[in-house]
Amino acid sequence: MRQDRTTHLTADINSSALILNLGSVSNIGKGVVEIDDEMIWLDSYDRVSSTATAAPYGRGYQGTTAASHTTNTKVTISPTFPRLSVKRAINDSIKAVFPQLFGVDKTTFSLTATQSTYSLPSAIDDVLGVSWDTPGPTGEWMPVKQWRHDKMANSATYATGQTISVYDRITPGRTVQVTYSKEPSILVNNNDVFETVTGLPSSAKDVIVYGASYRLASFIDPGRLTFTSAEADQADTKIQFGSGSNAARFMLALYQQRLAEEAGKLRGQYPVRIHYTRY
């Protein structure tokens, strides 16, 4: 598998500029380059002035978004795995682990003596547990044993369409806490914190990495990745066709194994709690 060739910008460019000032054009040719998350199709280059010219349609190529880029930003030439493709694979993996893996969050409300049913956030998938803040100095949160989660609540009365009804005798005015599972959220920004944004535990990071890896490798056979380099013919005699598919299957097996392990750990951390309900 060849190493991506790189250079850098020597001047800022805005989202509509077609002339790129580069640190080196020795590896540049007509084709695609990547700057940050943007793909750009280059139509020509000038070795004397170390510039490259994008085609009129070249900015924001292959579904990326044209953006401004600053001096010294890395320019990757014909990237094997474009950043946008990697990000999509990561987010596809995050979405695919649900419901085996799920995010956990909490919501609270104050109990009213005349009210038994309360609105819940629309993001709730299932209620994992309910507790309430008991009076006095003990600081104990007592489990609520009688409650009902309604996923099909009347939307005219409850905007989110989800409610919980509490039937235990709880001191009015006390805080009730609902712990619930939800679908993991995808990553959006480059500086997003995995645990904070997705809601998944930090130990699940490698599950997402394996999931993204097998998705990317499934479409590219590493035994044929060197077709753009001078040693292509020699490499083809040493690396059997299909090695990419084999690598993808291996990573898929690792993904499935780690997914099962993390799912078991999550079930152990949040076991099904017995409670009374009404129908």
Question: Language-model segments: which ranges?
Answer:
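Glycine-enriched, solvent-exposed interface loops adjoining structured elements
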Residues: 1-14, 27-53, 65-279
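Short alpha-helix capping/helix-loop boundary micro-motifs
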Residues: 17-23, 61-62
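Arg/Lys-rich RNA-binding interfaces used to dock onto structured RNA substrates
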Residues: 57
